[in-house]
Amino acid sequence: MRKILKLKIGRDELVFETGFMAKQANGSVLATYGGSSVLATVCCSNNVREDLDFVPLSVEYNEKYYAAGKIPGGFIKREGKPKDKEILVSRLIDRPMRPLFDKRFGREIQVIPTTLATDQLNPPDIVGMNAAFTAVFLSDIPFNGPIAAVRMVYLNGKFIVNPSFEEIHDSDLDIVVAGSLNGITMVEGGANEVSEDILLSAIDSAHEYIKQICNAQKEFLDIVGEKEKLPLAFEEKIFEFKEELRDFIYADLKEACFVKGKLNRDKAITLLRNKSYEHFSSLEKLDDSNESLFYKAFDDFEKEIVRNSILNDKIRTDGRTPNEIRDILAEVDILSRTHGSSLFTRGETQALAVTTLGTSIDEQIMDDIDGDKRLNFMLHYNFPPFSVGETGRLMTGRREIGHGHLAQRALESMIPGKNDFPYTIRVVSEILESNGSSSMATVCAGSMSLMSAGVPVKRQVAGIAMGLISEGDKYVVLSDILGEEDHLGDMDFKVAGTENGITGFQMDIKIENVTKQLMRDALEQARVGRIHILSIMNSVISNSRVGISKYAPKIIQLQIDIDKISLVIGSTGKTVKAITDEFEVKVQIEQNGKIILFGDDDFKMQKAKEKIESIVREPKVGEIYEGTVKKINSFGAFIELTPTKEGFLSTRLKSRDSKYGSGRFGHGNRYSRFGSGGDNIRGNAGLVRPPKLEEGQRIKVRIVDIDKFGKIDLEIVRDKDY
């Protein structure tokens, strides 16, 4: 039976419906906000696996073109592989939800939110998140919900919940916040150099709306009726010889955890793990039935040692104090033929960033249900397996897309507008080494690479990854975390920004008791670390290069009247194609009359500009043109001044001392065909005729008269006349 629940959030009602669509799924909910609707389903496998030590969850958010009344572009008229946007939204749904599933469930879980309608006003991603969370909460799958999500923006000094696309575009802060009744679990977004206080206030405001949605989900569960939960696949077991294992390894493991260098530390721990395995196997206390429990117990001891050292002794595995940042080395211009490059090394994490400048033809075209877009700034993040000393496939996964998007958002508020810098900008980050915080190393390397390329960015942007170790009311905030601290810690949050404020933010919280004061302390510690990193980056390069690389395409811009655009294009594009071929340039013509020329040769580009200016320029008496003889008849020749203008050169005899503007004489009214003789005819001294002309010949002429109908009369210009 169809069940409906409504609540007011922001400008519109958020509507949940269930019991009438996708009824064979373990859970299904249709969520609608304004005119945007998303159907979310959740299903689990019937196969139970007891050997899983993780949650086998997959989230596949997808958008249908029919939702916006569109048919997919391109040759194939069917939705294809997931777009980057769909992958990013899938990650937004996955991250806050994954920790709330019980690992003992032992079955694969798949959540599929599908956008069925969009009103082009309300972004469907937030609708999809709440549809997915509610579908799982109402299902028979064990889940520690409810959770909910909202988007908050800061616009004109006010916070707006679930804003429109236009409000998002105009805002200074745009974040997506997910959480439960007890606290925040995830935050992600970008900003235009906002303060830490504004970010905290936005998160606080978001949590109030999140609690409303969570309470509505509980009310909806009462209306629908709670399903009997599926049983857990296994009870949590512990290694029965755990205390013996502690006695055997603890002292050696404590020493191994603090070996300097990631590879050396991993090697020492692995040797000790293998030694322990062989020891307990020889005692016949280890077999296939408890092997996984042995490894879990070993990992628990490692986690206990590291966390206790940080909480009690304030010493991390690499010897640093909690707020200490690893050694940093920054370089620029390390690649000779690229348009801009930088190498940023922080401890054992290293990012090589390369900036390439292109033309508007190189823009990324986004065929999206929210409307077609053209992106002139892109950042691509690559994480090859050698960066962690491993082998593997070279491919772009969801993690790479997510990290690249975070770094791109952190930098894009510093990118100049198209009017100021009409280039397409692509930054590629190659992670050459990784031991934590590679996405923030990408921000730092990318910022310096942009300056190296001569992109007039406003300021340097630096990023830092922060962590948290807590126990009860006791906590320690960590600056510039290692990979293992990310894994063993209670919170992972990344902050990017300038010396003036925050530009990018991502946070995932694994515990519920994160207080506002804790977050304030963490953000302040991140700010101090960010300023330190910026000081090192600015000592290497603090301002963008003056001018771009000689290997980058050159650009010239000019503005013409809108009604002259057709003159530049010409019939069936004939004129603009001729300019392109003659001067070896690319010509972009915009609807507002702006013309952008792209090319590699400054001289040819300048000539192309002059050509266009001559095409759109209104002719004036006295101006000199180098024209082409198009046609000759008995009375004179038609001279093409520009592809859109012609003048007439009469065969009438001209006076040597005539002045342009008179055009005709009262005497010497004699005509002759071209090529009939010399300059002087029958003693008429001072009278001249044009030299012999041929069609296609180039000749310098001066405008001597323009009548009221626009007819242009010309005279020949000799070298001694100008």
From Swiss-Prot:
InterPro entries: ExoRNase_PH_dom1 (IPR001247), ExoRNase_PH_dom2 (IPR015847), ExoRNase_PH_dom2_sf (IPR036345), KH_dom (IPR004087), KH_dom_type_1 (IPR004088), KH_dom_type_1_sf (IPR036612), NA-bd_OB-fold (IPR012340), PNPase (IPR012162)
KH domain ranges (all copies): 553-612
EC number of this enzyme: 2.7.7.8
Swiss-Prot/TrEMBL keywords: Cytoplasm, Magnesium, Metal-binding, Nucleotidyltransferase, RNA-binding, Transferase
Gene Ontology MF: a single term: RNA binding
Domain of life, source organism: Bacteria
A single Gene Ontology CC term: cytosol
Subcellular location, record wording: Cytoplasm
PROSITE patterns, alphabetized: KH_TYPE_1, S1
Family recorded in the similarity comment: Belongs to the polyribonucleotide nucleotidyltransferase family.
Function: Involved in mRNA degradation. Catalyzes the phosphorolysis of single-stranded polyribonucleotides processively in the 3'- to 5'-direction.
PANTHER family: POLYRIBONUCLEOTIDE NUCLEOTIDYLTRANSFERASE, POLYRIBONUCLEOTIDE NUCLEOTIDYLTRANSFERASE 1, MITOCHONDRIAL
Protein name: Polyribonucleotide nucleotidyltransferase
Species per Swiss-Prot/TrEMBL record: Borreliella afzelii (strain PKo) (Borrelia afzelii)
Gene: pnp
